[in-house]
Amino acid sequence: MKKLVVDGQRFLNEDGAQVILNGINLVCKDKAKGYVEPCDAALFAWFREQGFNVIRLGLIWDGVEPEPGVYDDAYLSRIKQQVVWAEQNDLYVFLDMHQDLYSVHYGDGAPAWATLSDDLPHVTGHIWSDAYLESPAVNRALDHFWRNTFASDGIGLQDHYAAMWKHAAQFMADCPNIIGYDMMNEPYPGTSGQEVLGTIIAAYAGHVMGIADPNMEQLAGLWFDEEKRLEVLAGMAEMDTYRILVDSAREVSQIFEREVLAPFFSKTAAAIRSVSPDGFLMLETSYFSNMGIESGLQLVQDPAGQTLHHQVFVPHGYDLVVDTEHYDIYNQDRVHLIFATHRKVQERLNVPVLVGEWGAFSNHPATFQLSRQIIAIFERYLWSNTYWCWCDGFKEAPYAKALNRAYPQATAGVLSAYRYDHDTGSLSIDFVSSVGETLIYHPHLESISRSDVAVAGTDAYQIELRPFPDSKSGILAITVPDQGNKITVTIGSDVKGTIATWQAYQ
């Protein structure tokens, strides 16, 4: 597979073509399954047919290091087999060290030996993630991790984590399709997360309820009451109000990113880069930025203060009703705000964005249109993404139909815009041409003929249709020999109209 590099806010392959990565999460959090999704090579072939070209592939710390300093290479071998299947189907992979609620005791992630909760109680809520805000055990265990408290062998928990990452990266070092390392899924601050929540509650009380001196415990109880939570969400539906709420918590959330997360990333990155010098460092935000709090994330630097190469911003984005069936109050304006905030961070960092998680949808019929709307955001920003997540029933889900779309996988030149219309099946792409092939995935390639393709901006071009074996989908390759031309490619129903519009514009 062609090697990828980071060039400013773009991914480029070794030919210099601009690459859009479009894929899915494959993460098994079930210890009974050995933390490996049961599947075979056929699933990866299907991923390719669906237009996916990247997988966020989950690792679990408990799977990699079940005892202090003892690594389970049999587990890593099973994961590696999936990486090989991905390569055989032209799928890039980045490894995600996944955790939810920090530990196998409460969710998934850290092994029991790395879970130091000081015997505090674990409390759960209506939604799994409520435990971040309610469980003393989860927060104490996270506090010990961020403090690098010694494990039973006298080695710090973070030091174990970095060494574990080094071992995993070295084990996978001969896999050419592994592009990077997502160092921790959704880092949560621990006890200081209560301060973030408290700041938001105080802002809500003041701006929505008109209470200047709120009873914080009483107000927090509104969020943890399933029925009253819906009333709180209604108060957060107005975007000016929601901006005030997320902005109120920005500084306290960013303190964690600057003072705790940044040195953790530096330590972990150094371990990974010692065995994978060019692997992408995939940087996530604090957990709270999933909801639109602006991240203060900084790029990783070496001990001399030099910014390391090949870093990628991999934020997540979910509306507040995620993991529920309340699609009637799903707020697309909040989603736009979340990703607009991530875009602001990208412009500050000047690195590519690959949205590591979004969606988490059920089979509700509304998820088709919701997915289309979110994908339109990614198209506008020219972002890469991996949908959360592969699961039983995925192929029949409404949202899966929205994920199966035409898009430019590799553009020979500088991509400026593209858009796919599910209603008409048409795709438009604007770019400034360079040497090489532009490779366009289309889910209905078998129905496309050369007369369905228009290339405006040059009279000299070549088109080749490359269907996938036994599939309706495939790749449409376009070669434009002229360099520096403003090119518009249209595939689908409005070819003649697009040419006329382009000529009038010129």
Task: Show where each model-derived region lies.
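Acidic (Asp/Glu)-rich catalytic clusters
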Residues: F44-G51, M172-A173, L299-V312, R343-N350, ...
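Aromatic- and acid-rich polysaccharide-binding/catalytic face
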Residues: E227-A249, L299-N331
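Acidic-and-aromatic substrate-binding clefts and catalytic sites of carbohydrate-active enzymes
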Residues: D30-P38, V64-E65, D72-D73, P189, ...
